[in-house]
């Protein structure tokens, strides 16, 4: 690796809200665009520029590889030569973030510029002492837009992530420090050509940040101190073939300077709600600049590769500081009862005058109601159905037969038994118990049991439907014709005729109605009963007519004869 050329004289200025101090104008130089996006996987790594340094990205707790030994360590650049100085920052940059929209305060005047910081002390002694790296030359004019955009995006994100809308006070000026940038995973050659210590041999990261006063030296030294827990850094290439330029955070695009001016210096933006040092504050010699990053403990450092180039340290730190903004503890709101002064009813505490008056009125009203109870106005339908006395609302009552009764009044009409919760029968509008109601029922003439269901009444007597049958054949007579005998017993028609019908004097059979007819037709002659079919002449058997004509009956000596036979017998 070729030795870097001497960097131009740079002075550091400190301003309250600004990140960079204004410098004199220089001629504009077109910067080459980055060819590789270090954050995009798969892009090849650009070749390092002469005099460039490399920062390796690793994981927390991972031992970084030792620095390459195949290149000699160059001596530190000399001050005053700003024409051909090679920057230690790589030329590969990620796409710039969108420009910030909010305005920044004006840049400080040149009278407020502080003298440049002194160079870091060189390594003396054993390998345990920290080795200061060679100074990093300023970036050429082509990277000014990228740095301004990165700082603008950084400030915008910090403002949006602040829950309390923290702003840096305009009167606050942080003390100057020695190194605006700090590299963690790789080292730079020292002035004496001695390699720096590896990260595992670096001093403890818990040391405070030393503040070094700015001596009267015309160049800014960028120190690198390895830490036990390396943070991912970026490779930046800055070529000093052109004149150095300065950045002013008050404008999106800084004008080119015309003459060398003091180098810019970071102003740490410290939120008012956290005392932790900002990620973007410059570190001190000896690796103390990386301690704020270790305190923040960003988890994104674990996922970064160890060999891929990264964007500038301040941009990369902003991307990892977003999820870990330290928030201020929200004050606990006072309880609701403290905010509302109205006391809830029943809560302990002194009573107001209005509450005391209301309590006295309620007490007097209660005493009056107890001394003079009012009679309840009972409606007409709330009278007892038997005693016709009013029913109190709190008194239990029985609703039956469409009326209300006192429990003592709802009893059987015959035996005075209480009927509450029991089965009762209504007879002529009066309640009866089951026993008394059964006694009032008619009994069957056949079986002698009370008729509780259907009743059949015949010949002036009551019967169960299944008990009203023929006394001869026991066939039910419900719905059919029946005949009663002299003893008032029911008979079916066939059985009655068989038993009580007159018999024919010819065939000696009972004279019964013909099938399908209810009437019985018989012929009576000579005090004898005849069927219609049996009414004939005894001698010739000729059917006789019931009419008094020549075809009628001409009796003779007790015989039924026709006229011809009658004449014949009479002549003999």
Curated annotation (Swiss-Prot):
Keywords: Acetylation, Cell adhesion, Cell junction, Cytoplasm, Cytoskeleton, Host-virus interaction, LIM domain, Metal-binding, Methylation, Nucleus, Phosphoprotein, Repeat, Zinc. SUPFAM superfamilies: Glucocorticoid receptor-like (DNA-binding domain). CDD domains: LIM1_Zyxin, LIM3_Zyxin. Residues 63-78, 93-108, 253-265 have a biased composition (Pro residues). The modification N6-acetyllysine is found at residues 265, 272, 279. Residues 23-351 are annotated as: Disordered. One of its GO terms (molecular function) is RNA binding. Residues 143-156, 202-239 have a biased composition (Low complexity). Residues 319-330 have a biased composition (Basic and acidic residues). One of its GO terms (cellular component) is phagocytic vesicle. It is found in: Cytoplasm; Cytoplasm, Cytoskeleton; Nucleus; Cell junction, Focal adhesion. Pfam families: LIM (PF00412). PROSITE patterns: LIM_DOMAIN_1, LIM_DOMAIN_2. Residues 384-443, 444-503, 504-570 form the LIM zinc-binding domain. The modification Phosphoserine is found at residues 116, 142-143, 169-170, 259, 267, 281, 288, 308, 344. The modification Phosphothreonine is found at residues 179, 270, 274. Changing residue 114 to A: No targeting to focal adhesions and reduced actin-rich structures. The modification Asymmetric dimethylarginine is found at residue 253. Residues 240-252, 305-318 have a biased composition (Polar residues). InterPro entries: Znf_LIM. One of its GO terms (biological process) is cell-cell signaling. The modification N-acetylalanine is found at residue 2. Interacts with HPV type 6 protein E6. Does not interact significantly with E6 proteins from HPV types 11, 16, or 18. Interacts, via the Pro-rich regions, with the EVH1 domains of ENAH, EVL and VASP. Interacts with the first LIM domain of TES. Interacts with NEBL (isoform 2). Interacts with SYNPO2. Belongs to the zyxin/ajuba family. This is Zyxin. It comes from Homo sapiens (Human).
